[in-house]
Amino acid sequence: MGLYKLYRSIYIDSDEESLSAIKDFEMLEGYDPYTRDRIEEIIELNRIIELDDDDVIYDQIYFPYNPLHQVIEARRANLVEIILDQGKYTVNSVNDDFIFYPLHVLTCVPETSDVLTYLNEIEEFTLVKDLELRACKMNLSKSISIAIIKQVLKGIREFTDNDLRKLDNQIREDELKIAQLLISRGAKLDIKNEYGYTPLRNTVINGNFALTKLLLDNGADASIKCNGMTIFEISTLSQNVDMIKEIIKRCGYNHDSKILCRVASKGYINVIHFLLDIGFNVNSFDSFGETPLHAATRSGSVETVNALISYGSTVDIKDNIGSTPLMHACGNKDISKLLIEKGADPNISNIHGYTPLHNAAAYGSVDVVNLLLSYGVSIDAKDKIIGSTPLDHGVHHPEIVKLLLEKGANPNTINLYGYTPLKNAILKSRLSAEYIIPYVVLQDFSILDGRNMPGSGINMELIRNDKLLQNIKTSCEIELKRMKEIRISNRYSLDIFITTSNIKFLSRLVTNDKFSSINISSFPIYKSLLQNAINSAIELRKCLDVALYTINSRLENTLWDMLPIEIKNQIVLLLDNTDLSIISNSIQHSQN
C-alpha cells in the first residue's frame, strides 16, 4: 500500500476499507509516522501547495502523509475518532517539517488542483472548479470543495443547488465534530505552524464562522498577530461580514490604513461597504501612497471601483510617484472607462512622465488603448525617464504596435539612448518590427525632407542592415508608387488618403466616381490604412450632406439661398463634430 493509494482510499472508500488501507500502510517495514521517510514520494512532484488564500502560498511542499492528518483533511469525522481511539496518534501529532498540527490541517482548505493531482484525477479539475464557483456564489463554505471532490470521484456529476447546500451542511457538521473531538482531547489551540499561523487565523481567513466561534469559545487567543496582522485585519479578508462583526464584538478593531486597500485589491465589495459604513476613510493611503481606489483597479471589479467612487473616493488622487487609479487600471477597459466617465484625466502623467497610454500599451490592452485614443490623448507623449513613447512601451505586443501606428503614432521618434521604436522592436518582437516598416517608409515618402529626420535616418540604416526588412521596404515602395499613379483628381492621387490625416479634405475627394473602379485589395500592405481613411471620409461626407440639406431647408427663402453652392460647402466644412451631431439630433427630434 503506497502513500498515494492510501490518500485515494481515504477520499473514496468506506470507513472499513480506509481503515484497512491505513493498517496495510503502517505495516510497511520501517514505517515511522513521525519521520519524513515517506515524503520522498511527494517531493518528486516538486509542487507548491496553496493551502488557503491568495495571500499565503507555502513555499515548500506540504502533504498530509500522517494518516491522521489525511483523514482530517478529507473531513472523515468517524475515522478521526477511530484513529485517535487506537492511540497511535494524538491530537497534537505534528508534521515536523511544517509544524502542522491536526488543528492546522482541519482549519486549512487544500488547493483543488493539488488534491486531484495526488488522487490522479486532474481531468476532473474543470468540473470541480465550476461547482466550487457555483458554491461560492451561493455563499457556501470553502471547505465544500472537499465534499465536491469526494462526490465527483464517486461518479456524481450533476448537482442541484439543494445538493450543494446539503454537502455544505454536512462538511460543516463534520468539521465541527472533528474540532470538538480534537479540543476535548487536549489539542493545542494557539500552536503556530512554521509560518506563524494559528488555527484561529486559518478559520478566520477562510470565513469559517462556526469553527471560529468554537475556537474562541474554548479560549483561543485572539490577540496573536500573524504576519503583523491583527485578527480583525485577517477577518476582513474572509469575505464574511458576519465573521468580521463577530471579531469586532469580541476583539474590537483598528483603523490601519492598509486594511481598506487590501480588501479593495481583492474586490470584496460587501466587506468594503461594511468598513466604510463603520467609519473607514475611503481616501486613506498606504506606505506607497495608494488609496483603496488604486488598489481596487487591480481587482478587476467594476462594482468595487464604482462603490468606492460613490463613497467619495477622489478619482485622480495620486500615489507617491504621481500615478492615478486610471494608470493602474490600464489593463481593464471597463474600469478605465468608468474612471474616465467619473472624471479621471486620460492625459495625466506621473513624475516619470508615464501616461495612461504608456501603461495600456505596456499591458498590451488593445481595448484600453482604443478607449484612451477616443478621448484624444497624446499618442506620442514621451516619458521623463528615457523619452520613450507609448509605441516604444508596446513593442513587445505586435497588436498594440499595429493599432498605434494605424492611429498615427510616429515610428521615427528617438529616445535618450538613440533608440527608435523599430530598434526596440527588432530586439523584442520581430513581428512588431515588420509592422513598423510600412509606416517608416510611408513617412519618408510623405515628408519632403523626411530623409533628413534623425529618426528616419536611424530606421533606414536598420532596414538596410536586415535583408527581410529591406524586402518589406521594397514592397512598400512599390505599392506607394502604384498609388501615386492612380489619379483621383487633377491635383491628387490615391496616395493622398494615407499621406494626410485631414478627413474633411478627403471628404471632398471621396465623391469622385473613380473610386468605384479602384481595387483596394490590390494594395495588401496599405489596404487597412486606405480603407479606414476612405470609410471615414465617406461617413463624414454623409454627415456634411445631411447638414447642408438641413440648413437649406431651415433657411429657405432667406439670403442663404443666394450663396453659391461652393460657398455653402465651405461653410458646412467649418462645422465640427459637435455641430454636426446637434444638427443630426435636431432632425431625429423633428421626425419624432
Swiss-Prot record:
InterPro entries (UniProt xref): Ankyrin_rpt, Ankyrin_rpt-contain_sf, PRANC_domain
UniProt feature coiled coil, ranges: none
Keywords tagged on the record: ANK repeat, Repeat
Keyword Repeat: yes
SMART domains: ANK (SM00248)
Entry's transmembrane regions: none
Start-end of each ANK repeat: 63-93, 162-191, 195-224, 227-255, 256-284, 288-317, 321-348, 352-381, 386-413, 417-449
Pfam families linked to this entry: Ank_2, PRANC
Protein name as it appears in the record: Putative ankyrin repeat protein FPV246
Organism for this UniProt entry: Fowlpox virus (strain NVSL) (FPV)
